[in-house]
Amino acid sequence: MPNKFLIIDNSILPDIFEKVVKVKELLANGKVKDITEGVKTVGISRSTYYKYKDFVFSVSEGVKSQKATIGLLLGHERGTLSKILDRIAEYQGNILTINQDIPINNTANVSITFDISQMSIGLKELVEEIKNTKNVIKVDLIAME
């Protein structure tokens, strides 16, 4: 079953979820040296942190996302990546980074990060269009910020 993401106002959630996010922020900013120190700082158990850390995220810059990263597995065929980039640009997406592995067994992994703040269609619709592009084997939304 595919993951389904919801945006929920933290005021209706138990405090535990916000504390898990706080530990992740403290670790990322270097304000605590490890998970043990982080969970003590915010007042939750290590087991609670580990239970929810991969499932609770904060939304950066309010509700409207600015950047998205997609991961693709592409067949090694001339013009495939170009068609995908054209599709993103067609809907006013702005490419920020492209990382491409060398093709092995006629397939290549590619990740593309792009600005979605001015896009004329939703990200879900764009991903569906990319999935339907010739020689696209797989598309995954990796991150949104």
UniProtKB/Swiss-Prot annotation:
Residue stretches making up the ACT domain: 69-144
Domain of life per record: Bacteria
Coiled-coil features, chain-numbered ranges: none
HAMAP family listed in its UniProt record: UPF0735
Similarity annotation: Belongs to the UPF0735 family.
Name this protein carries in UniProt: UPF0735 ACT domain-containing protein CBO3010/CLC_2906
Organism the protein comes from: Clostridium botulinum (strain Hall / ATCC 3502 / NCTC 13319 / Type A)
